[in-house]
Amino acid sequence: MPPHPLRVAVVCSSNQNRSMEAHNILSKRGFDVRSFGTGTHVKLPGPAPDKPNIYDFKTTYEQMYNDLVRKDKELYTQNGILHMLDRNKRIKSRPERFQSCRDQFDLVITCEERVYDQVLEDLNSREQESFQPVHVINVDIQDNHEEATLGAFLICELCQCIQHTDDMENEMDELLQEFEEKSHRPFLHSVCFY
């Protein structure tokens, strides 16, 4: 088992749905967890697919919530966005961008391949300082409320298994292979260094 609790980052595009659902569940299970997005802006569904609500990462969840209540409370209640923002503001005040964070993690879990590529690109562009390894794992999760919940439990189970390995560096590939077979989902895995 690692000498300290596993430091985990969960990353999706906007730090709203998938990463926050996993953040919520991992936090309740006692993990040292943070969540992030990799997009240039935070996007939430709007009144039509081609009209998303776009916010800066500095915008708080509370401000987004109030803005959407003002725009169309019924629509955003019905589609679950207000409920999601209400959960988010109880976890932290605003979304965070992965590329702006300089904290070090043992494990970074992404929720889609495009985000995985952005995280790897960011980590590989940083100057190496501590040469501390970080495992980056992608778990593909569709961006809807139900899949976010199922994906969060899968991520939690994966983190619990990794937390209990004796030798994370040597057991990771075998562990991920077992998870792929069990969950019928492909996982991507890379190791980067801080």
From Swiss-Prot:
GO terms for biological process: mRNA processing; termination of RNA polymerase II transcription. GO terms for molecular function: RNA polymerase II CTD heptapeptide repeat phosphatase activity. InterPro entries: RNA_pol_II_suA. Keywords: Coiled coil, Cytoplasm, Hydrolase, mRNA processing, Nucleus, Protein phosphatase. It comes from the Eukaryota. Belongs to the SSU72 phosphatase family. This is RNA polymerase II subunit A C-terminal domain phosphatase SSU72.
